[in-house]
């Protein structure tokens, strides 16, 4: 993964209270208008103490940040190009997802959104 994204993730994690975070994996997701991501937990990593750092690029999206049970109503958090979200500690296993992406065009990425989800997988 490009060093610049590792640096952004490391600095954002430190600012959120997760000093020493060193991502070793990056999940890249591309969304087109109408695409969504259902509520889920990121719990397949060996190290669940390390945070998740999400970098949004392209079209705006609405991030859903729920509770520890899928049935808990999630908060809606608007995300724009360049936004970074960090969650870890007790929030690490909260359900989260993305509302269906609205139509639009971004000057750099066109009709799409790209999300980089950096984490410590191993």
Language model features: what each stretch is:
Residues 1-122:
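Non-heme Fe(II) oxygenase metal-center motifs and adjacent flexible, charged/small-residue loops
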């Amino acid at each position: 993964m490009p060093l610049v994204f590792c640096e952004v993730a490391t600095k954002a994690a430190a600012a959120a209270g997760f000093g020493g975070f060193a991502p070793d994996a990056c999940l890249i997701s591309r969304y087109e208008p109408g695409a969504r991501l259902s509520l889920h937990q990121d719990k397949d990593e060996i190290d669940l103490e390390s945070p998740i750092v999400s970098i949004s690029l392209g079209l705006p999206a609405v991030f859903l940040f729920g509770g520890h049970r899928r049935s808990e109503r999630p908060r809606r958090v608007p995300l724009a190009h360049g936004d970074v979200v960090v969650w870890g500690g007790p929030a690490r296993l909260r359900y989260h997802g993305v509302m269906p992406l609205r139509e639009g065009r971004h000057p750099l990425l066109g009709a799409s959104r790209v999300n980089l989800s950096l984490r410590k997988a191993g």
